[in-house]
Amino acid sequence: MVPDQHSNTYLEPSSSLPLTCTRAGTCCHGKMVWINPWELTRLAEASGEGVAAFAERCCEYGGIRLRFDGPPGWKGLPACRLYAAERGCSVHAARPLSCRLYPLGRERQVKTVRYLHQGIRFPCLEGCADVRDLPALTVQDYLVGQDVTPGEAAQDAYLEVMQELAEAALILLIDGGLAGQGDHQVLPRWRGLGAAHPRGLVQAIAPDWLSALTLPGFACDSADPARFAAVHFAQLQERAQRLFASLREADALREASCTMMALALHLGRALGSSPDQLVHRWIITAKKHGARE
């Protein structure tokens, strides 16, 4: 059987690969770099801008993806908005986890973490052939050199925030009494949110809620990303309790549940997850409590 060229190659910490960067900037062109709120805040601070101003200038979809609309480079692909041909990344010290990891990826299932690269052939060989002439590194040494620990802590902490937001959507549906009454309006809306284009999902979230999710209004503690995420979630939780705790009317509960689900899915996309797959899992849970499509 011929291996699937699009499948992932999973790696061991001791796997040795041509991971010494050529500094050619190839990987700063034509990519999709999703960022979480901690990363957005770090990038804004490194740029000397407020978070909202930086997100408007350098990001898409409310601040969860970096813009790649700079001058064309390798294969005519556009550069990241933060890339400068004469000096490389303008915020290198604050670069997001996905940039630090590249060409590797990180996959987390519950508490198991695996590292991988896309395809059978090592990705850097096409755009940076000179990498063969540079020292090989083990995966473990590469990760240490890229200082991925803070970014991984932020990613994992925001995965927990995503789950808590989805739990809030489920609580509004289930504890609010809708699921037990066989509600058939909420789940189709959830399904639609999961299938929506990123722009459509942004439009489904009220602007004040979108800002609360993606533009946290406090300074970044780069040494403690987990605390940053915890403070951010506490703000979101307080807002949800203030607005939704006293709801009793069915339509209001439906709207609140869909709001929390939209927030969970939007954050999930920022973390590299598939909203469609995420919402399918949460719909299964809701159906066990009586909700219907």
Q: What function would you assign to each model-found segment?
A:
Residues 1-26, 33-41, 45-79, 83-88, ...:
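Short loop/turn segments that flank or connect secondary-structure elements
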